Amino acid sequence: MSKLTKKKKQLLELVNPENTYSLEEAMNIFQKVKSNNFDESLDIALRLGIDPGKSDQNVRGAITLPHSLGKTVTVAVFADGDHAKEANDAGADFVGMEDLADKFKKEEIDVDVVISSQAAMKIVGQLGQVLGPKGLMPNPKTGTVTEKVGEAISNAKSGQVRFRTDKNGILHGCIGKVSFSSSQIQENAAAMLEEVKKLKPATAKGAYIRSVALSSTMGPGVKVSPASLVI
Protein backbone atom coordinates (compact mmCIF):
# COMPACT_ATOMS: atom_id res chain seq x y z
CA MET A 1 0.00 0.00 0.00
CA SER A 2 2.88 2.37 0.79
CA LYS A 3 4.24 1.93 -2.75
CA LEU A 4 0.86 2.82 -4.24
CA THR A 5 0.59 5.91 -2.07
CA LYS A 6 4.11 6.94 -3.02
CA LYS A 7 3.33 6.53 -6.72
CA LYS A 8 0.10 8.51 -6.44
CA LYS A 9 2.00 11.31 -4.75
CA GLN A 10 4.60 11.18 -7.49
CA LEU A 11 1.90 11.44 -10.16
CA LEU A 12 0.32 14.46 -8.51
CA GLU A 13 3.70 16.17 -8.51
CA LEU A 14 4.38 15.38 -12.16
CA VAL A 15 1.00 15.98 -13.83
CA ASN A 16 -1.13 19.09 -13.71
CA PRO A 17 -4.56 18.08 -15.07
CA GLU A 18 -5.07 21.64 -16.34
CA ASN A 19 -1.96 21.53 -18.52
CA THR A 20 -1.48 20.19 -22.03
CA TYR A 21 1.88 18.52 -22.62
CA SER A 22 3.95 17.74 -25.68
CA LEU A 23 4.42 14.09 -26.58
CA GLU A 24 8.05 14.25 -25.42
CA GLU A 25 7.00 15.64 -22.03
CA ALA A 26 4.30 12.98 -21.66
CA MET A 27 6.74 10.17 -22.47
CA ASN A 28 9.16 11.52 -19.86
CA ILE A 29 6.37 11.36 -17.28
CA PHE A 30 5.49 7.77 -18.18
CA GLN A 31 9.14 6.77 -17.96
CA LYS A 32 9.43 8.23 -14.45
CA VAL A 33 6.39 6.37 -13.09
CA LYS A 34 6.66 3.14 -15.08
CA SER A 35 6.39 -0.25 -13.42
CA ASN A 36 9.56 -2.24 -12.90
CA ASN A 37 7.62 -5.49 -13.23
CA PHE A 38 6.27 -5.30 -16.79
CA ASP A 39 6.22 -3.20 -19.94
CA GLU A 40 3.06 -1.12 -19.62
CA SER A 41 0.73 -0.46 -22.54
CA LEU A 42 0.23 3.09 -23.74
CA ASP A 43 -3.33 4.03 -24.68
CA ILE A 44 -4.69 7.01 -26.56
CA ALA A 45 -8.07 8.64 -25.86
CA LEU A 46 -9.56 11.01 -28.41
CA ARG A 47 -12.52 13.18 -27.44
CA LEU A 48 -14.48 13.50 -30.66
CA GLY A 49 -17.02 16.08 -31.74
CA ILE A 50 -19.79 13.55 -32.26
CA ASP A 51 -23.16 12.76 -30.74
CA PRO A 52 -22.65 9.27 -29.26
CA GLY A 53 -26.41 8.94 -28.89
CA LYS A 54 -26.73 8.74 -32.68
CA SER A 55 -25.74 5.35 -34.06
CA ASP A 56 -24.54 6.84 -37.35
CA GLN A 57 -21.97 8.92 -35.45
CA ASN A 58 -20.31 6.08 -33.57
CA VAL A 59 -16.76 5.59 -34.82
CA ARG A 60 -15.02 2.24 -34.94
CA GLY A 61 -12.28 0.74 -37.03
CA ALA A 62 -9.01 -1.16 -37.12
CA ILE A 63 -5.46 -0.32 -38.12
CA THR A 64 -2.11 -2.07 -38.43
CA LEU A 65 0.27 0.34 -36.73
CA PRO A 66 3.75 1.13 -38.11
CA HIS A 67 5.27 -0.31 -34.94
CA SER A 68 3.69 -3.55 -33.72
CA LEU A 69 2.75 -3.97 -30.07
CA GLY A 70 4.49 -7.34 -30.10
CA LYS A 71 1.53 -9.06 -28.49
CA THR A 72 0.56 -12.66 -29.18
CA VAL A 73 -3.00 -12.47 -30.53
CA THR A 74 -5.45 -15.35 -30.11
CA VAL A 75 -8.03 -15.56 -32.90
CA ALA A 76 -11.31 -17.49 -33.14
CA VAL A 77 -13.05 -17.87 -36.50
CA PHE A 78 -16.65 -18.82 -37.19
CA ALA A 79 -16.65 -20.53 -40.58
CA ASP A 80 -17.23 -23.83 -42.33
CA GLY A 81 -16.27 -25.45 -45.63
CA ASP A 82 -13.61 -23.65 -47.65
CA HIS A 83 -13.59 -20.71 -45.26
CA ALA A 84 -12.82 -23.03 -42.35
CA LYS A 85 -9.92 -24.56 -44.29
CA GLU A 86 -8.66 -21.08 -45.13
CA ALA A 87 -8.86 -20.12 -41.45
CA ASN A 88 -6.91 -23.18 -40.33
CA ASP A 89 -4.28 -22.62 -43.00
CA ALA A 90 -3.92 -18.99 -41.89
CA GLY A 91 -3.20 -20.01 -38.29
CA ALA A 92 -6.50 -19.38 -36.49
CA ASP A 93 -6.43 -20.69 -32.92
CA PHE A 94 -10.07 -21.83 -32.93
CA VAL A 95 -12.30 -22.59 -35.91
CA GLY A 96 -15.88 -23.84 -35.86
CA MET A 97 -19.59 -23.12 -36.02
CA GLU A 98 -22.10 -24.32 -33.39
CA ASP A 99 -19.33 -26.15 -31.53
CA LEU A 100 -17.32 -22.93 -31.25
CA ALA A 101 -20.40 -21.02 -30.12
CA ASP A 102 -20.88 -23.57 -27.32
CA LYS A 103 -17.31 -23.00 -26.14
CA PHE A 104 -17.97 -19.28 -25.85
CA LYS A 105 -21.26 -19.84 -24.02
CA LYS A 106 -19.51 -22.12 -21.54
CA GLU A 107 -16.60 -19.65 -21.23
CA GLU A 108 -14.15 -22.40 -22.14
CA ILE A 109 -11.96 -20.17 -24.31
CA ASP A 110 -10.44 -16.71 -24.07
CA VAL A 111 -9.52 -14.89 -27.29
CA ASP A 112 -8.46 -11.43 -28.44
CA VAL A 113 -10.26 -11.34 -31.79
CA VAL A 114 -13.35 -13.04 -33.24
CA ILE A 115 -13.74 -13.24 -37.02
CA SER A 116 -16.74 -14.55 -38.94
CA SER A 117 -17.61 -15.36 -42.52
CA GLN A 118 -20.82 -13.70 -43.65
CA ALA A 119 -22.71 -17.00 -43.65
CA ALA A 120 -21.62 -17.81 -40.09
CA MET A 121 -23.07 -14.58 -38.69
CA LYS A 122 -26.39 -16.39 -38.22
CA ILE A 123 -24.65 -18.27 -35.41
CA VAL A 124 -22.50 -15.41 -34.14
CA GLY A 125 -25.58 -13.20 -33.93
CA GLN A 126 -26.86 -15.40 -31.11
CA LEU A 127 -23.77 -14.60 -29.03
CA GLY A 128 -24.40 -10.89 -28.62
CA GLN A 129 -24.63 -11.04 -24.83
CA VAL A 130 -21.44 -13.10 -24.65
CA LEU A 131 -19.23 -11.30 -27.17
CA GLY A 132 -20.69 -7.79 -27.01
CA PRO A 133 -19.60 -6.83 -23.47
CA LYS A 134 -16.06 -8.01 -24.27
CA GLY A 135 -15.85 -5.97 -27.45
CA LEU A 136 -15.44 -9.14 -29.50
CA MET A 137 -18.54 -9.00 -31.69
CA PRO A 138 -17.46 -9.23 -35.36
CA ASN A 139 -18.27 -6.17 -37.44
CA PRO A 140 -17.77 -5.34 -41.14
CA LYS A 141 -16.34 -1.92 -40.18
CA THR A 142 -13.39 -3.58 -38.44
CA GLY A 143 -12.92 -6.19 -41.14
CA THR A 144 -13.97 -9.03 -38.86
CA VAL A 145 -17.06 -10.01 -40.87
CA THR A 146 -15.54 -10.96 -44.18
CA GLU A 147 -15.21 -13.50 -46.95
CA LYS A 148 -11.44 -13.01 -46.82
CA VAL A 149 -10.96 -14.78 -43.49
CA GLY A 150 -7.31 -15.60 -44.17
CA GLU A 151 -6.47 -11.95 -44.72
CA ALA A 152 -8.40 -10.94 -41.60
CA ILE A 153 -6.49 -13.51 -39.52
CA SER A 154 -3.18 -12.25 -40.90
CA ASN A 155 -4.11 -8.67 -39.99
CA ALA A 156 -5.11 -9.68 -36.47
CA LYS A 157 -2.00 -11.77 -35.90
CA SER A 158 0.24 -8.95 -37.16
CA GLY A 159 -1.00 -6.74 -34.35
CA GLN A 160 -3.92 -4.91 -35.92
CA VAL A 161 -5.41 -2.58 -33.31
CA ARG A 162 -9.16 -2.10 -33.02
CA PHE A 163 -10.69 1.10 -31.70
CA ARG A 164 -14.16 2.47 -31.04
CA THR A 165 -15.96 5.30 -29.31
CA ASP A 166 -17.59 4.80 -25.93
CA LYS A 167 -20.93 6.16 -24.71
CA ASN A 168 -19.30 9.53 -24.00
CA GLY A 169 -17.92 9.97 -27.51
CA ILE A 170 -14.35 9.19 -26.48
CA LEU A 171 -12.39 6.88 -28.75
CA HIS A 172 -9.91 4.49 -27.15
CA GLY A 173 -7.06 2.50 -28.65
CA CYS A 174 -3.64 1.11 -27.73
CA ILE A 175 -0.73 2.70 -29.60
CA GLY A 176 2.33 1.14 -28.01
CA LYS A 177 4.35 0.34 -24.93
CA VAL A 178 6.08 2.62 -22.44
CA SER A 179 9.38 1.15 -23.66
CA PHE A 180 8.75 2.56 -27.17
CA SER A 181 10.70 5.63 -28.23
CA SER A 182 8.89 8.95 -28.62
CA SER A 183 9.28 8.69 -32.40
CA GLN A 184 7.66 5.23 -32.45
CA ILE A 185 4.72 6.47 -30.38
CA GLN A 186 4.44 9.56 -32.58
CA GLU A 187 4.31 7.46 -35.75
CA ASN A 188 1.72 5.09 -34.27
CA ALA A 189 -0.39 7.96 -32.93
CA ALA A 190 -0.21 9.83 -36.25
CA ALA A 191 -1.36 6.71 -38.09
CA MET A 192 -4.24 6.29 -35.65
CA LEU A 193 -5.28 9.94 -36.01
CA GLU A 194 -5.26 9.73 -39.80
CA GLU A 195 -7.41 6.60 -39.75
CA VAL A 196 -9.89 8.18 -37.32
CA LYS A 197 -10.12 11.30 -39.50
CA LYS A 198 -11.04 9.13 -42.49
CA LEU A 199 -13.94 7.73 -40.46
CA LYS A 200 -15.46 11.10 -39.53
CA PRO A 201 -19.26 10.72 -39.68
CA ALA A 202 -20.85 12.83 -42.42
CA THR A 203 -23.36 14.20 -39.90
CA ALA A 204 -20.76 15.28 -37.30
CA LYS A 205 -20.60 19.05 -36.86
CA GLY A 206 -17.86 21.38 -35.64
CA ALA A 207 -14.35 20.40 -34.61
CA TYR A 208 -13.90 16.65 -34.93
CA ILE A 209 -10.91 15.84 -32.71
CA ARG A 210 -11.48 17.99 -29.62
CA SER A 211 -8.69 16.75 -27.34
CA VAL A 212 -6.11 13.99 -26.95
CA ALA A 213 -4.86 12.19 -23.86
CA LEU A 214 -2.34 9.41 -23.33
CA SER A 215 -2.24 7.04 -20.39
CA SER A 216 -0.11 4.10 -19.34
CA THR A 217 -1.43 0.96 -17.65
CA MET A 218 -0.34 2.05 -14.18
CA GLY A 219 0.17 5.73 -14.84
CA PRO A 220 -1.81 8.95 -15.18
CA GLY A 221 -3.89 10.33 -17.99
CA VAL A 222 -1.92 13.14 -19.61
CA LYS A 223 -3.43 15.72 -21.97
CA VAL A 224 -1.29 15.91 -25.09
CA SER A 225 -1.13 18.54 -27.81
CA PRO A 226 -2.46 17.03 -31.05
CA ALA A 227 0.17 19.04 -32.94
CA SER A 228 2.96 17.10 -31.20
CA LEU A 229 1.55 13.84 -32.59
CA VAL A 230 1.63 14.95 -36.22
CA ILE A 231 4.65 13.84 -38.24
Residue positions per predicted region:
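Flexible, glycine/charged-enriched surface loops at secondary-structure junctions
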Residues: 38-42, 199-211
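Flexible glycine-/small-residue-rich
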Residues: 46-48, 79, 117-118, 175-177, ...
